[in-house]
Swiss-Prot record:
InterPro entries: NADH_Q_OxRdtase_chain4, NADH_Q_OxRdtase_chainM/4, NADH_UbQ_OxRdtase, ND/Mrp_TM. Belongs to the complex I subunit 4 family. It catalyses: a plastoquinone + NADH + (n+1) H(+)(in) = a plastoquinol + NAD(+) + n H(+)(out); a plastoquinone + NADPH + (n+1) H(+)(in) = a plastoquinol + NADP(+) + n H(+)(out). This is NAD(P)H-quinone oxidoreductase chain 4, chloroplastic. It holds the Pfam family Proton_antipo_M. The keyword Hydrolase does not apply. Keywords: Chloroplast, Membrane, NAD, NADP, Plastid, Plastoquinone, Quinone, Thylakoid, Translocase, Transmembrane, Transmembrane helix. Its EC number is 7.1.1.-.
Length: 503
């Protein structure tokens, strides 16, 4: 048995190493950029080594467990552990954060603080995915608020303060429900309050109280996911944030809410989840259609991509509500798939804006000839977004689709109706994606404009785009590479779920 604190090192290393950035030389930003990038690469290598040599894929139990006393009065411990649900999001966090650091090269104002905030987010995100203590989960959840708020309010567009304030109000409001739920779970049914996640999993709750807990946690996670109607902060945030920040938001932050729904709502409250799962499927289906139609009407490029993210999150919600192993595995695969695709689209949108200084689609057109590399990459990730066969999104959406069809909980006509509406959402995706490509790259508006000389993608942008495209294609061609991480854990969740239902 390995007692080396691998997870603690993985969690605390980025933020502690990032604090050194304030003591680096003042001359230029080159040293700061390279130092931060090296920290991210080293962290990713340590994480990959730990999971390759100290994690058993076929073991659904919690592995690499670490427990250290923290606050004795509340029995609050530093509890860390990983399983099949955690590994994928943690590796995704390391990969996207490393590339977002590379994408942040144009940031020159207050670069020390900028890169430190990115590393602080890195620690918070990994800490959340690895935490096995409810209070630690809440702390890591809240650790995201301040870095994201500062990244939004200090680096972004003209309305960045408005979008940052809207973000903090929504997420802080959701955090109140999360805190109330954590305290309620801790104080119920125990002589001594404990935040131990395992204790809460094995605890039975009265039906009414379980529903109240479920709703409280659901509101907190629905804000972060986001789920209708708590999604309105997302387009404003993406529309104003720097594209490296957008990569972290779309690639990782949104996935924290979906992870919380599976980790807490499904595992801790099976009876309530059984009651609310039909509503999750309905909301997810409506979200797909609504966000797709709204995306089609957006003039702002980044807002169009933001609404496409909301639409794709609908698949995750439907997969969680399907209560089948196929659907839940599809939802987990969609979390990873959209993490790559969403981050890449926002990066390419940002690099395009750096060159043409335009963000409205009706002002663009005709740049495909002048920027063929960016056109090729943008087209590739747009195809991945609309679930082209051979790309990761195709497998994820197909699994969710089959999951809802094979669900025994729902009536036959209900499944037919849901599948039909999902098919409409799938059809709407290429409409807004291909329309975006047509408005940006085709035509002659900018091609014939005076002084319309634009630089194409450089080595840095090309390397970053290809680095994301390769896993998207790899997962699309061999999805078992990701599914093998979660399939055993999903079976345990559902078997435990139905066992608790019988009791």
């Amino acid at each position: 048995m390995n007692f080396f604190p691998w997870l603690t090192i993985i969690v605390v290393f980025p933020i502690f190493a990032g604090s050194i950035v304030f003591f680096l030389p003042h001359k230029g930003n080159r040293v700061i950029r390279w130092y931060t990038l090296c920290i991210c690469i080293l962290e990713l290598l340590i994480t990959t080594y730990t999971f390759c040599f100290h994690f058993q894929v076929d073991d659904p139990l919690i592995q690499l467990e670490e427990t250290y006393k923290w606050i004795n009065f509340f029995d609050c411990h530093w509890r860390l552990g990983i399983d099949g649900l955690s590994v994928g999001p943690i590796l995704l966090t390391g990969f996207i954060t490393t590339l977002a650091t590379l994408a942040a090269r144009p940031v020159t104002r207050d670069s020390r603080l900028f890169h430190f905030l990115m590393l602080a987010m890195y620690s918070g995100q990994i800490g959340l995915f690895a935490s096995r203590d409810l209070f630690l989960f809440f702390i890591m959840w809240e650790l995201e608020l301040i870095p994201v708020y500062l990244l939004l309010s200090m680096w972004g567009g003209k309305k960045r303060l408005y979008s940052a304030t809207k973000f903090i109000l929504y997420t802080a409001g959701g955090s109140i429900f999360l805190l109330m739920g954590v305290l309620g779970l801790t104080l119920y049914g125990s002589n001594e309050p404990t935040f131990n996640f395992e204790t809460s999993v094995n605890q039975s709750y009265p039906a009414a109280l379980e529903i109240i807990f479920y709703i409280g946690f659901f509101i907190a996670f629905a804000v972060k996911s986001p789920i209708l109607p708590l999604h309105t902060w997302l387009p404003d945030t993406h529309g104003e944030a720097h594209y490296s920040t957008c990569m972290l938001l779309a690639g990782i932050l949104l996935k924290m809410g979906a992870y919380g729904l599976i980790r807490i709502n499904m595992e801790l409250f099976p009876h309530a989840h059984s009651l609310f799962s039909p509503y999750l499927v309905i909301v997810g289906t409506i979200q797909m259609i609504y966000a797709a139609l709204t995306s089609l009407g957006q003039r702002n490029l980044k807002r169009r991509i933001a609404y496409s993210s909301v639409s794709h999150m609908g698949f995750i919600i439907i997969g969680i509500g399907s209560m089948t192993d196929t659907g839940l595995n599809g939802a987990l695969l969609q979390i990873i798939s959209h993490g790559f695709i969403g981050a890449a689209l926002f990066f390419l949108a940002g690099t395009t804006y750096d060159r043409i200084r335009l963000v409205y689609l009706d002002e663009m057109g005709g740049i495909a000839i002048q920027m063929p590399k960016i056109f090729t990459m943008f087209s590739s990730f747009s195809m991945a977004s609309l679930a082209l066969p051979g790309m990761s999104g195709f497998v994820a959406e197909l699994l969710v689709f089959f999951g809802i069809i094979s669900a025994k909980k729902y009536l036959f006509m209900s499944k037919i109706l849901i599948s039909f509406v999902m098919a409409i959402g799938i059809i709407l995706t290429p409409i807004y994606s291909l329309s975006m490509l047509r408005q940006m790259f085709y035509g002659y508006k900018l091609f014939n404009a005076p002084n319309s000389s634009f630089l194409d993608s450089g080595p840095r942008e090309l390397f970053l785009s290809i680095s994301i495209l390769l896993p998207v294609i790899g997962i699309g061609m061999y999805p078992d590479f990701v599914l093998s991480l979660s399939v055993e854990k999903v079976e345990v969740i559902l078997s435990h779920f139905f066992y608790r239902q019988v009791l």
